């Protein structure tokens, strides 16, 4: 509404939607109302904030300018409805009045958890402050939000902080509109707030600050500790001693997966390289793990067993407790406390039970974690930071898409690295990271996360439920169950199409495009395993127009775990029985196993067809002796990339393409020849990456020329690979194409639920 005032005084009602709860928005409104001599009130309506003001027209105009331009740093205004109403001089002052529950289906937005602010950090380190060394210090501008809230409106009684009644001094701050802790729901102090304690697994051995000091001592001595934080639990140990890190790997069952570490800016400069974008992410209030390039001095400070890649995942402290851990150590391993494939533990009893035998000691506290939330992870690829995992610090804040939609859509995601998503109007509410839903405990976590996001977005009615095409996914079965419960239609989206739609929605780009959808596995429209797809998006429809050569996945899922099987399968196609003689050099298969594998290949028994990019890269990794057994998702190809990075020369490549199909048998055969000719592994690894990148780009270019399309994009788990993605990007830009890539949602399966929502809307009219 354009405010054209007639008369000296007037009354205006303002409805503010967006991130306006738990971010100091009402105190801010109070202050600018008082500053501008206005009367009225501000009220939290559960899913929006209502403001009623009366006063002089110029004062109201100034108030609205302040509202738009001086809002709190954590807030976000998505919509501002302003209407003039009749009557004046109803109020004698300006008030913050009691919140109301949401009365309609309009969604509210719960802010994400944010790192401790500079003001709170300063107070916590001030010996004269009453919150000196108090690990749960928080205010309006920082601290837990999503992880403590049970329902809207975001008031203390609706959070786990209701277990801690405010003391007199905290209550005074909480009620003072001019105080930084006015209506800050996480407000507390050592007298009235949560308490930290240290356990040896049997009994409490230290409490309060003594527990923290003893934890630091135990870490320095080389012990492994479970540390309960804001959204879950970490396992921590020192980074510099091989035996300590190896012991954690042994106990946790993670033999090679790189560990993330927690450090501080002055220390990180010693062992890692980072640019301005990466530095800003590390220091941001959202505090994700940022994947950084190791520096030349890395080995001076870190055990080689922390990360066997050329990168290291680093996060900075994001709670008061984290800061208090740093004394002598420059960094700690800080990895999620979960067994492979299972959710991170969060409740004290569960922590003590499930981490028994893994952690030596347990630093716990008595504040309930309502919503589990893993650390977010970002990585710089193609000149931008992209999400490997979008969780703490970001979820459940919505992603806005410029798309017309009047339905409530529930999207249940894929199977691995999963999230779910609620779509309401133009807002896509992704859940926190869920994980591998083929595991029962994680499947239950998915169900709980869906119920929670429905509650927090005030969603009672679902019009459509979207799932993957794969009939055996647990998420597909859940979709069928929920479809019946809500009386909602069910809509299925092919996995790689969902990746492509995710890319389109992420970029608010809905014109024609060629999209490379590349990953390890996805159920194809033909019933085969896809993963190296060239997709045409034209006139609002998605179509597969090219792909990698079909290969046999020897032993089905066993070929994903043991990449030598994939190598043997492709080499057998290239050189016949000689492949079996060659594979013996790795001393991996027994003679009996080789006879069985030969029989399987000859008869095509349990040899599903795949076009997966991941499986081809896995085969190269095995060929070069880099990885023979996958112990975490994507390991063989992830470990191949740093080897390829070490090659600095140029390679002339002419990928073999026929009928828009990239010949990957040729890729493996050429790599095999190079190995026999004693070419170095770095060159062969680099060759494989460039062959795939250039080959797929050539197919995309040919199709774009045929249809007159000027946009090329890349998505899927393989698009985290810097060599492949940046090669395709540079090729596209050099040839004058518009290149699109992810920026707001994960490239991988964490973005599938988002893409499912976009797919449904576009299929039903845009």
UniProtKB/Swiss-Prot annotation:
<feature type="domain" description="YrdC-like">
    <location>
        <begin position="209"/>
        <end position="393"/>
    </location>
</feature>
<dbReference type="Pfam" id="PF22521">
    <property type="entry name" value="HypF_C_2"/>
</dbReference>
<dbReference type="InterPro" id="IPR004421">
    <property type="entry name" value="Carbamoyltransferase_HypF"/>
</dbReference>
<keyword id="KW-0479">Metal-binding</keyword>
<dbReference type="InterPro" id="IPR041440">
    <property type="entry name" value="HypF_C"/>
</dbReference>
<dbReference type="GO" id="GO:0051604">
    <property type="term" value="P:protein maturation"/>
</dbReference>
<dbReference type="Pfam" id="PF00708">
    <property type="entry name" value="Acylphosphatase"/>
</dbReference>
<feature type="zinc finger region" description="C4-type">
    <location>
        <begin position="167"/>
        <end position="192"/>
    </location>
</feature>
<protein>
    <recommendedName>
        <fullName>Probable carbamoyltransferase HypF</fullName>
        <ecNumber>6.2.-.-</ecNumber>
    </recommendedName>
</protein>
<dbReference type="InterPro" id="IPR055128">
    <property type="entry name" value="HypF_C_2"/>
</dbReference>
<dbReference type="InterPro" id="IPR017968">
    <property type="entry name" value="Acylphosphatase_CS"/>
</dbReference>
<dbReference type="Pfam" id="PF17788">
    <property type="entry name" value="HypF_C"/>
</dbReference>
<keyword id="KW-0862">Zinc</keyword>
<dbReference type="InterPro" id="IPR001792">
    <property type="entry name" value="Acylphosphatase-like_dom"/>
</dbReference>
<feature type="zinc finger region" description="C4-type">
    <location>
        <begin position="117"/>
        <end position="142"/>
    </location>
</feature>
<keyword id="KW-0863">Zinc-finger</keyword>
<keyword id="KW-0436">Ligase</keyword>
<dbReference type="InterPro" id="IPR006070">
    <property type="entry name" value="Sua5-like_dom"/>
</dbReference>
<dbReference type="InterPro" id="IPR017945">
    <property type="entry name" value="DHBP_synth_RibB-like_a/b_dom"/>
</dbReference>
<comment type="pathway">
    <text>Protein modification; [NiFe] hydrogenase maturation.</text>
</comment>
<dbReference type="InterPro" id="IPR051060">
    <property type="entry name" value="Carbamoyltrans_HypF-like"/>
</dbReference>
<dbReference type="GO" id="GO:0016743">
    <property type="term" value="F:carboxyl- or carbamoyltransferase activity"/>
</dbReference>
<comment type="similarity">
    <text>Belongs to the carbamoyltransferase HypF family.</text>
</comment>
<dbReference type="GO" id="GO:0016874">
    <property type="term" value="F:ligase activity"/>
</dbReference>
<dbReference type="InterPro" id="IPR043129">
    <property type="entry name" value="ATPase_NBD"/>
</dbReference>
<dbReference type="InterPro" id="IPR036046">
    <property type="entry name" value="Acylphosphatase-like_dom_sf"/>
</dbReference>
<dbReference type="Pfam" id="PF07503">
    <property type="entry name" value="zf-HYPF"/>
</dbReference>
<feature type="domain" description="Acylphosphatase-like">
    <location>
        <begin position="11"/>
        <end position="98"/>
    </location>
</feature>
<dbReference type="InterPro" id="IPR011125">
    <property type="entry name" value="Znf_HypF"/>
</dbReference>
<dbReference type="GO" id="GO:0003725">
    <property type="term" value="F:double-stranded RNA binding"/>
</dbReference>
<dbReference type="GO" id="GO:0008270">
    <property type="term" value="F:zinc ion binding"/>
</dbReference>
<dbReference type="Pfam" id="PF01300">
    <property type="entry name" value="Sua5_yciO_yrdC"/>
</dbReference>
<comment type="function">
    <text>Involved in the maturation of [NiFe] hydrogenases. Along with HypE, it catalyzes the synthesis of the CN ligands of the active site iron of [NiFe]-hydrogenases. HypF functions as a carbamoyl transferase using carbamoylphosphate as a substrate and transferring the carboxamido moiety in an ATP-dependent reaction to the thiolate of the C-terminal cysteine of HypE yielding a protein-S-carboxamide.</text>
</comment>
